[in-house]
Each structure stands twice: as structure tokens, then as C-alpha cells.
UniProtKB/Swiss-Prot annotation:
Family in the record: Belongs to the RimM family.
Domain called PRC barrel: residue spans: 96-168
Source organism, top-level taxon: Bacteria
Protein localization: Cytoplasm
Protein name, per record: Ribosome maturation factor RimM
Annotated source species: Streptococcus thermophilus (strain ATCC BAA-491 / LMD-9)
Length: 172
């Protein structure tokens, strides 16, 4: 079975079994909604068990998640440092123009016929996502995911077509 990273448990939160999760997923509200099933993996990427979300809230830069049946700090403390993942079969279908992070990361980025680099990470700083593009011999390029910049995404072809606006590439 294929799993995709959703977040990393970085600490406990209070005494009632809540966990502080550093999210690395798209569609956070969907991933952590009540009754969502996630898989827990240890720091060596070994499957531990499936967990069902009992509650979720945001606190500062973290997602605070509580799992069904784990209602005390003693039940969850051992999971600090573990990863949360979603099984591929639990992913929902997306609308046209929407993509999962795992579909975008690794795609080649082109401006015309010129290869710029490859998407290595996706950041969520605010209003829109920012794609981090790894380039050979240059600093990473921060590419905002907005229509004037990202012209086409072809997951099947492994290609993203962009038009770099003036000022985006500080190495020109």
C-alpha cells in the first residue's frame, strides 16, 4: 500500500491526549477532519497502526490533533517524533486544476523550452502556495502558484510550464 506524508508529531499538547502536529500536507482541514483515518509510522518509517481523528484545531503554526481511544498524555507521549500518513486509497478525487503535493513535487519546471529546475518542496506562507524549485548551480527559485506565473501543469508528462515575472528570479 502507498502512503503519503501528512505531518510529523512534534510534541504533546496538554494532558488530555492531544498532539502537536507539524503539517506537511495539502487540504489540512480534510486530512484532520473528525473520523479521518491516518496511519502512524515510527521514526524509522515502520507502520505502527491506524488512528481515527477525534478532534482537530489550529494553534499558532501547529495542528492540534486528538485520536479516538487515546485520551491521556500517557497514551500518546510515545508517539512524539512519529509521522502521520494517509493511504492512497483514502485520497479524494480533485477538481480540474487541483493537485496533491506528491503529484507536484519532482516535476520539471520549464519556461518555454528552457528547463529551470525541479519542484522540491511546497510552502504555504499565506494566500497562495509557493513552489520551491531546485536549480543547478543557482539558488532555489521561489515560485508563487498563481495564474500569471504557472501556465500549465501536466502531471502525466512530468512538466510544469511557467512564465517568470520580472523580479521573481533574483539571479538574472
Amino acid at each position: 500500500m502507498t502512503y503519503y506524508n501528512v505531518g510529523k508529531i512534534v510534541n504533546t499538547q496538554g494532558l488530555q491526549g492531544e498532539l502537536r502536529v507539524l503539517s506537511v500536507t495539502d487540504f489540512t482541514d480534510e486530512r484532520f477532519k473528525k473520523k479521518s483515518v491516518l496511519a502512524l509510522f515510527d521514526d524509522k518509517d515502520n507502520y505502527i497502526m491506524d488512528v481515527e481523528v477525534a478532534s482537530h484545531r489550529k494553534h499558532k503554526n501547529f495542528d492540534i490533533v486528538k485520536f479516538k481511544g487515546l485520551y491521556h498524555i500517557n497514551d500518546v507521549e510515545k508517539y512524539k517524533g512519529c509521522s502521520l500518513k494517509i493511504a492512497e486509497e483514502n485520497l479524494t478525487d480533485l477538481d480540474d486544476g487541483e493537485f496533491y503535493y506528491h503529484e507536484i513535487i519532482g516535476l520539471d519546471v520549464y519556461e518555454g523550452n528552457t528547463l529551470i529546475g525541479q519542484v522540491k518542496e511546497i510552502l504555504q506562507p499565506g494566500a497562495n502556495d509557493v513552489w520551491v524549485v531546485k536549480r543547478k548551480g543557482k539558488k532555489d527559485l521561489l515560485l508563487p502558484y498563481i495564474p500569471p506565473v504557472v501556465l500549465d501543469v501536466d502531471v502525466a508528462a512530468g512538466r510544469i510550464e511557467v512564465e517568470l515575472m520580472e523580479g521573481l528570479d533574483d539571479e538574472d
